[in-house]
Amino acid sequence: MNRRNALKTMALTPLGRLAAGLPIGWAGTAYASDAPETSDVRFGIIALTDCASIVMAHELGFFKKFGINSVISKEASWAVIRDKLTLGENHATHMLFGMPFASSMGLLGSPVKPMVIPWLLNRNGQAITLSNKLKGVKTAKDLKPIVDKAKAANETMTFAMTFPPGTHAMWLRYWLASGGIHPDKDISLITIPPPQMVANMKINKMDGFCVGEPWNLRAISDGIGYTVTTTQKMWVDHPEKVCAFTEEFANKNPKTVKAVLKALHLSSQHIDNMGNRPAVAETISKASYINCQKEIILDRLKGVYDYGNGVKEQDPNYMIFSNRNCNAPMKTYGYWWLSQFRRWGMVKGPQNYKQIVDKVIRPDYYMEAMKELGVKTTGTDMQPVKLADGTFNPNDPEKYAKSFPVHSLAG
């Protein structure tokens, strides 16, 4: 053995590490006992602004810091996101809140595959866009007579969301119903992947859509639509996207899950430093991520809202990634989601809400990861939540589901 190889070998031994001033157990980026079980992790994302914390953790080396060799895979639709996580082609994924529940329960065409939510990626920052031909409509109540007239003429209006059990579907249903419009009876509701929304509105395939940024502002920039409302006006600091894993992967790789969460904590803090947002917008605007002009991404990231109908404002409730206890996976939100599945007939009869929520929402991973980072966690779960039209009590989701005049309750 030559001298160079001997030194390399010695460096790998406990004595060699000690001689070099490194603690025994140190594995380069983490103590060996804390090293992730699986170091190669493939992340699925969709071309939306709220993929930012996953992308920036990759770009800034935060995944690497915690022993994760990350690969980012941009997918074409939420169905592909679900399927690749289900099949193990991706190990962690950018996902709509609601999708892990649908997969765990086998709802709406999802194969049964238990999934877990240990981390909320972001809050706020989605919107509903209407075609410019509807300018003048400011509320769902304004829209109702137009919807009714079209229905009577056998020219039913069409609205798009991104995935049936997901956030955009629920926000669109919630908004339409607030104006007395039944999303299952009065209009046609279709599924379109986020990056394809603007192109489909250009060819008059729909009258409106609900999606995340930057596609609402892109519709304004392209001169085809305007923002009638944002989702934060329905529910301030609502949950939006999550970082999801299959239950099987999380059970086998708990240290990997925690390493991912630690990296996301750092990237989320980085993004919520507003001085970093211009550079973040530039990074995520790349063709390999969102493929959209950085200026269109940045405006609403900064809370600068031009609604495209003459209304402009600085919205204090812009998209957040870390602030205001953003990342905590609160069970309250799971109960709300299940109440909406119930309201819209996606499940039949009362559900075992607690059993389902406890299985999917996993604050234990979050709490352990933050404790290991020395980060103090705050916030109280299972508290009433105020929405635009009332208060949700997570302790009685069945009563809440039955409280709406517009519904599709089944069983």
Regions flagged by a language model, labelled:
Residues 128-129, 242-245, 249-250:
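Short glycine- and hydrophobic/aromatic-rich loop-to-beta-strand nucleating segment
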Residues 50, 59, 81, 100, ...:
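Stable alpha-helical elements in mature extracytoplasmic
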Residues 90-92, 192-227, 246, 278, ...:
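Ligand-binding pocket segment of bilobal, Venus flytrap-like solute-binding proteins
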Residues 5-29:
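N-terminal export signals
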Residues 335-411:
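Conserved C-terminal helix/tail region of periplasmic/extracytoplasmic solute-binding proteins
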Residues 252-362:
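Secondary-structure end/capping motifs
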